[in-house]
Amino acid sequence: MSTLASTRPPPLKLTIPSLEEAEDHAQERRAGGGGQEVGKMHPDCLPLPLVQPGNSPQVREEEEDEQTECEEQLNIEDEEVEEEHDLDLEDPASCCSENSVLSVGQEQSEAAQAALSAQAQARQRLLISQIYRPSAFSSTATTVLPPSEGPPFSPEDLLQLPPSTGTFQEEFLRKSQLYAEELMKQQMHLMAAARVNALTAAAAGKQLQMAMAAAAVATVPSGQDALAQLTATALGLGPGGAVHPHQQLLLQRDQVHHHHHMQNHLNNNENLHERALKFSIDNILKADFGSRLPKIGALSGNIGGGSVSGSSTGSSKNSGNTNGNRSPLKAPKKSGKPLNLAQSNAAANSSLSFSSSLANICSNSNDSNSTATSSSTTNTSGAPVDLVKSPPPAAGAGATGASGKSGEDSGTPIVWPAWVYCTRYSDRPSSGRSPRARKPKKPATSSSAAGGGGGGVEKGEAADGGGVPEDKRPRTAFSGTQLARLKHEFNENRYLTEKRRQQLSGELGLNEAQIKIWFQNKRAKLKKSSGTKNPLALQLMAQGLYNHSTIPLTREEEELQELQEAASAAAAKEPC
């Protein structure tokens, strides 16, 4: 400062201001220049909102740079103010020597310097408070402290600065990122829902169009309704007059066509299932199935001069006409009435009569056991043989077949014959030969019956030699549902209780004996195929309580068994 004072020109007439005037002058400058500086520095020194997270080192470096710039500007301003005041105070003191200890205005200059330093500190605190004033982005609440009786500004106030805005910025950025993620998720859900709605709307639109088309077809008035109305009006106008034959024919034809269309519509699902079958049985179940072979036989028979009469009177006249040969084959189609096998004579051609009777059985049979066959090789009387109930020999040709009454009950459901459920090809009519059938037993002669030895008696007849053939049960034909149920029950338990057997007989419509025999046969087949013996049987065999057929008997046991058989045979002959 002394060098500045020495280089100046000689001072003019100056007056030394008092302490109060110096304070007033400093306050005016602080209010004028300092306020402008604060106004100028405030927008520049405020921290700007950052895009990057607050914890990054770049944000911290920028904040430190801004703070250092603000502090440097404040220091420069303070130095300028101090230099101005020093110049004002040194002007009157320049008259005195620099080496003198006691000068004229030295006491006042120390007091002025103390006051100026206090004012500079106050101004610095004001600037700092303006710079660190909480902004709108800050999440900290500002608390207004009551004015204290002490000094307006103290060094402790400088230490209590507001917290940094970095935490608020971090929280704001984190929440904004979460909000953006939620928005993206909602948009993705909305897009997926829109796609699903579009697909379902398209499918529903197609179904609606199909339903509308079906309803339109159903609501369209058909020609049959119009014809029916016209016929009704015609009949109402002229009740005594007869309908024209041409109109009646048209009406009948339309009715038949409409009925056929409705039948096809109702059986749509069944037709679909039948198409899916690899081998269909529709042709087998038709009445004229296998008719080609009899036609060939009929042609060969016509060459030989033989023919079969198709009349219902039972006459055995030979017409020699091919139409007479084919009429029994077409009878089930046209009339729907079954052929009476008792009145038909199969004298010349056995294959033709067999095919016609079999076709009748297939089309009109109501009982699976009514399998009647006629064969000229086994039956000389020409009457059909009923395998269900064999007639006595005295009845002769007067016995009627079971198939004669089969077509009468049209309301009952059709039950197919047993050969339909058989899997062997030889049992089907397409094999060219008759299904397996028991040959009728020949009546036993009196001599063979009186002989007592039973040499002339057939194997199947009764042991008492009464001459009546044994009534054997035909082979049981189970339906598909019955077999499936029986197999399911067998898999559940191989042995049935009496209560369970009764329940099954009621549910399946079978006899208890049939169910019992089926289970026995199933167990025997399983045992034979597996080759292993029942552990219970093995245990009983080891204890000697179970005599299996495979165990050889001793000589004494064989003799005892023969004695028992002889005693039983003698007891059976005594009542006769």
Curated annotation (Swiss-Prot):
Biased composition (Acidic residues): 80-91
Family: Belongs to the engrailed homeobox family.
Protein name per Swiss-Prot or TrEMBL: Homeobox protein invected
Biased composition (Gly residues): 450-468
Tissue expression summary: Expressed in row 6/7 of the embryonic neuroectoderm.
GO molecular function, one term: DNA-binding transcription factor activity, RNA polymerase II-specific
DNA-binding region in chain numbering: 471-530
Localization per Swiss-Prot or TrEMBL: Nucleus
Organism: Drosophila melanogaster
InterPro entries, alphabetized: Engrailed_Homeobox_TFs, HD, HD_engrailed, HD_metazoa, Homeobox-engrailed_C-terminal, Homeobox-engrailed_CS, Homeobox_CS, Homeodomain-like_sf
A cellular-component GO term for this protein: nucleus
PROSITE patterns per record: ENGRAILED, HOMEOBOX_1, HOMEOBOX_2
Ranges annotated as biased composition (Low complexity): 309-325, 364-381, 395-405
Record-level GO BP terms: compartment pattern specification; imaginal disc-derived wing vein specification; neuroblast fate determination; regulation of transcription by RNA polymerase II; wing disc anterior/posterior pattern formation
Protein role: Engrailed (en) and invected (inv) are functionally redundant transcription factors in neuronal precursor cell NB5-3 specification. Inv is unable to substitute for en in other regulatory processes such as maintaining gsb expression in the neuroectoderm after stage 10 of embryogenesis. Maintenance of gsb expression in row 5 of the neuroectoderm involves an as yet unidentified short range signaling molecule.
CDD domains assigned: homeodomain
Transmembrane annotation, as ranges: none
SUPFAM superfamilies hit by this protein: Homeodomain-like
